[in-house]
Amino acid sequence: QKALEGIDGEIIVIDNASSDDSCEMMKAKFPHIKLIENKDNLGFPKGNNIGVAQAKGEYICILNPDTVAAEDTFSKILSFVKSSEVEIFSSNSQLGIIGCKLIDGAGNFLPESKRGVPTPWVAFTKIFGLYKISNYFGKYYAQHLSENESGKVDILVGAFMVMKRELYLE
């Protein structure tokens, strides 16, 4: 909620048939947030589709239910989107999906934040730990980029993805 302060945005929460009182808690504590209560557990992807269909913004963020966004996350991402850096990373000046540096509850960087395509060779180097020896073997975790560096990657983890709504609907 604080991450959207000063930003014209909305929060849509999809509940996939929770058996606890989380929907009642959401209604009581966050009455301005749009809550969609599914009668059945349709799964994360279908829940995303339902939420995006209701969204009104130009950009959407797919966010795992256990992910916490820092207060400046969305303002930084929107600034990045509007900057010239986007053209550097996209060959045809069309923005794809933006991810961010993910950290765990202890504050440690999650290398899964950015990955390469797991070809048989790339998977082999990961399984046998070769990526720890040299960045030459670091394609699985896209080690061509440091944890604090922006750049193009093949795969983003689904815990946090920002994109134009139009792109998602394609």
Locate predicted features.
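Aromatic-glycine-rich donor-binding/catalytic loop that engages nucleotide-sugar donors
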Residues: 142-170
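The conserved acidic donor/metal-binding loop of glycosyltransferases
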Residues: 64-68
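Conserved donor NDP-sugar-binding/catalytic core segment of glycosyltransferases
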Residues: 71-112
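Short, acidic, metal-binding catalytic loop of nucleotide-sugar glycosyltransferases
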Residues: 1-8
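Short, flexible, basic/aromatic active-site loop/helix in glycosyltransferases
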Residues: 117-153
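Glycine-rich, basic loop-to-helix element that forms the pyrophosphate-binding segment
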Residues: 37-55
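Short aromatic/hydrophobic "clamp" motif used to bind/position activated sugar donors
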Residues: 60
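A conserved acidic beta->alpha catalytic loop
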Residues: 15-24, 40
